[in-house]
């Protein structure tokens, strides 16, 4: 007679056995905070981009996490061009909240892109840690009444600093020093997408 309590050594392992619960929980917290999971993160101590272990975890166990989040009512999306992952909500209430967050992100990215293009610089520099937005840029944008009005319409009452912080908290932008910012691969991808849509309109 078989002992039901003893594990069978020849049984196939579940994909859950391959991922530590602490790692799954860390990923879940990132997504719940509205962040995208980018391939590289900015390390302030080393002043360079470093590999994101959570990105590698998702990439190496993609099938497992797609199924896992599907059971939670979400769609795990991998964007190959921008090298990042994000969650799409499936319920109407959450989709509405997602739309508002997406709108606010788009407003900030469009303002940054518009300002950068007007200053005669190539948008690609926005994704470089040694370039991006500097102190003079922040002062100029913060003094522009039109920009501030647009930001207020998107519910950024405190102006540019609140808007930039909104992107930083979502891994769409990094702060590389005092009054210095640059777009992550995900932030740059979304900006390029917005520019393409604008040019086709």
Each predicted region: which residue ranges?
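Short amphipathic alpha-helical interaction segments
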Residues: 57-65, 150-169
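Short basic alpha-helical hairpin corresponding to helix-turn-helix/winged-helix-like nucleic-acid-binding
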Residues: 67-72, 77-132, 136
